[in-house]
A protein has these predicted regions:
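Short loop/turn motifs that connect adjacent beta-strands in outer-membrane beta-barrel proteins
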Residues: 1, 23-31, 76-82, 119-125, ...
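Outer-membrane beta-barrel "beta-signal"
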Residues: 11-16, 177-179, 187, 212-226
Length: 226
């Protein structure tokens, strides 16, 4: 399975990756997951700019690159799939600041990941994802619930909530609505034969503790079983 995602807002993150299950994504068995992502977020430069000494730190940008390769086991049941992963991760981050005299070295760490994709009934979907890593001492989690209304859409529609935190003290909370597991109509891509290409979109309210102002966010995820 190939996948990619974009999380856009005041801070943004884009990633892509692949999942491989030798016995099939719908069966019990081993599974591996590899990802590569890039993030960009604004923050105050309290350390590298002289204006910070006067209490007026300018805004700067933090660039982050993360990569991970984890392996684990998935359990497939009639109600859905659950999986646990562990493996190494690599992180590199740098500030657009006068105090950045040279690029820092990448940091190596360990990553743990848990996923749940469950259908309690034929018309409902519950998802949960939790990722924790030591390269940046970061954690990200998201839960969602959705209901499928065939008269309106093939997607599951419902609420979602997410939280991200890392060692810098940065915290980002979000609450919104999502549409999960739908394809593009042929009228949009009439020349492409990708009936298995699926999508997830969401949008809502986000609050970043360091900025202390609410904002809005939007996400787009696509996956293609192979």
């Amino acid at each position: 399975m190939l996948f990619g995602s974009l999380d856009a807002g005041r801070s943004s993150f884009v990633s892509a990756g692949a999942k491989f299950a030798p016995d099939g994504v719908g069966r019990d068995g081993p599974v591996t997951l590899a990802t590569l992502g890039y993030g960009l977020r604004p923050e105050r430069d309290w350390w590298g700019d002289p204006r910070a000494q006067a209490g007026r730190p300018p805004r700067t940008l933090r660039h982050t690159v993360q990569a991970g390769a984890v392996a684990g086991w998935q359990w497939a049941r009639d109600w859905g799939v659950a999986a646990l992963f562990a493996g190494p991760e690599l992180a590199f981050e740098v500030l657009d600041s006068p105090g950045t005299e040279r690029l820092p070295a990448p940091r190596l760490g360990a990553r743990m990941q848990a996923e749940l994709w469950a259908r309690p009934t034929d018309a409902t979907l519950v998802t949960a994802t939790l990722i924790g890593g030591t390269a940046r001492w970061s954690a990200w989690g998201r839960v969602s619930w959705g209901v499928r209304l065939p008269a309106l859409s093939e997607a599951y529609l419902g609420p979602e909530a997410a939280l991200y935190a890392d060692r810098t003290g940065y915290r980002k909370w979000s609450l919104g609505l999502h549409a999960t597991d739908f394809g593009l109509p042929q009228i949009i891509l009439p020349q492409m034969s990708l009936p298995q290409l699926r999508f997830r979109v969401s949008a809502g309210w986000v609050y970043e503790e360091q900025i202390r102002r609410p904002g809005i966010y939007g996400t787009l995820t696509a996956w293609l079983p192979l």
